[in-house]
């Protein structure tokens, strides 16, 4: 249990450090960013498919955005401030395809994070996931947009 807490603390620290400054042009205005790290290799998880869904009034999940992580393990540009309105969102990270591409048979099909967004006004959300073949850990950093 203590090692799990330490792992979560390290993941949160990694996300915090990565949020210290923008990593590219125009990314500071990105209201939703996903970062995926490979705990086995100690590196960014590259080319991981990410799907984002928004909960509809009838409680079903509607596709909202999708993409793949970059060489830095990050996915920016999923949405705009205008499109990312108040609501319940689900980020689904395709862990199975990632591990299969590396020749590893994983336990999980995907990792998912369901969260309420912008219920207290506009915010910036960074969802981070630390992956291994038989476990995953997620954390989020939520900040106010800079004026």
Curated annotation (Swiss-Prot):
The keyword Signal applies. Residues 1-20 form the signal peptide. Sulfonation of the reactive cysteine Cys-30 enhances the stability of the native conformation of TTR, avoiding misassembly of the protein leading to amyloid formation. Detected in liver. The modification Phosphoserine is found at residue 72. The keyword Transmembrane does not apply. Glycans are attached at residue 118. Keywords: Gamma-carboxyglutamic acid, Glycoprotein, Hormone, Phosphoprotein, Secreted, Signal, Sulfation, Thyroid hormone, Transport. GO terms for cellular component: extracellular space. Disulfide bonds: none annotated. The modification 4-carboxyglutamate is found at residue 62. InterPro entries: Thyroxine_BS, Transthyretin/HIU_hydrolase, Transthyretin/HIU_hydrolase_d, Transthyretin/HIU_hydrolase_sf, Transthyretin_CS. GO terms for biological process: purine nucleobase metabolic process. Its main location: secreted. It is found in: Secreted. GO terms for molecular function: hormone activity; thyroid hormone binding. L-thyroxine binds at residues 35, 74, 137. The modification Sulfocysteine is found at residue 30. Belongs to the transthyretin family. Homotetramer. Dimer of dimers. In the homotetramer, subunits assemble around a central channel that can accommodate two ligand molecules. Interacts with RBP4. Thyroid hormone-binding protein. Probably transports thyroxine from the bloodstream to the brain. This is Transthyretin. It comes from Pongo abelii (Sumatran orangutan). The gene is TTR.
